[in-house]
Amino acid sequence: GDLENIALEVFINLGNLNYLKNINGLITKNFCNDKINFVENLDSLSFPAWEDFPLENYWKLGYSHGPLSEKKYISVLSSRGCPYPCNFCVVPKTNERRWRLRSPKNVVDEIEYFVKKFDVKEFHFEDLNPTVNDSRIKELCNLIIEKKINIKWKIVAGTKVESIKSEETLSLLKKSGCNYISISPESGSKELMKKINKPFNYDHALKIVKGMNYNKIFSQACFIIGYP
């Protein structure tokens, strides 16, 4: 489930293990409580209160999930969950293979808000798979282009490369300021991919990676070394 509706109660009672055992939606090494409902309308959530977080400390140290092009950046979560069944990953169980999305307008509104508030020019998308819906990612790119929002943005958490459908999508990503995409092929072994239950189209993946190179979008591939 999602933490928003129980976060305050959890933080207030962090030191009280007996109390935490009664809050649904929590899992620890000692207990696994019942699930809680997901937030169905992600657009209904407020933008993150980054003003209450020591962003300057992270900027000074250069800490980030993806490589930095600017001194200042902010993380964005434009969707939650993942529809794929990979058996090495906790997400299919915790999110029931559901991919929930924010509207492109809501995401771009958040970007605009933090550009104005913090003079930030770089955004790191932390979604597990922000490119699952091709029409949605294109709409998001087009909104950034139409609004003339001058930013760099990166997909940093390892999106499924085949969910990037075409060279047209790559071109829009580039025009909107995307200059880095982390992808997750996991392995070059088709036998291992079957074992981890991850469908993968190698031919399409290679085509998209070549398209990234052509559009000068830096790519990083994540691999699993050793699978029990």
Name these PLM-found stretches.
Residues 1-41:
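Glycine-rich beta-alpha loop elements in corrinoid/cobalamin-binding modules
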Residues 48-220, 225-227:
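Radical SAM [4Fe-4S] cluster-binding motif and immediate context
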